[in-house]
């Protein structure tokens, strides 16, 4: 695995995969899936004063936030902490 450590006020997020079927059971083709803006925090930068999330948090982030990066064929984002709009509690 690549070891990516975000710098300063940045956060590395693993993007939650879009659902592959609807509530009624219909399968959604790959090209028709909506891109989600929910993910799990994988790593945080060193500027702890500006970062209010921690590793393992599920977060909602701005739709066009961050820079996309693939790690082990999974979609991730590196974005600024201020682009995270909410923590999702389950």
Curated annotation (Swiss-Prot):
CDD domains: cpn10 (cd00320). One of its GO terms (biological process) is chaperone cofactor-dependent protein refolding. Its main location: cytoplasm. GO terms for cellular component: cytosol; membrane. Coiled coil: none annotated. It comes from the Bacteria. The keyword Cytoplasm applies. Heptamer of 7 subunits arranged in a ring. Interacts with the chaperonin GroEL. Belongs to the GroES chaperonin family. Together with the chaperonin GroEL, plays an essential role in assisting protein folding. The GroEL-GroES system forms a nano-cage that allows encapsulation of the non-native substrate proteins and provides a physical environment optimized to promote and accelerate protein folding. GroES binds to the apical surface of the GroEL ring, thereby capping the opening of the GroEL channel. This is Co-chaperonin GroES.
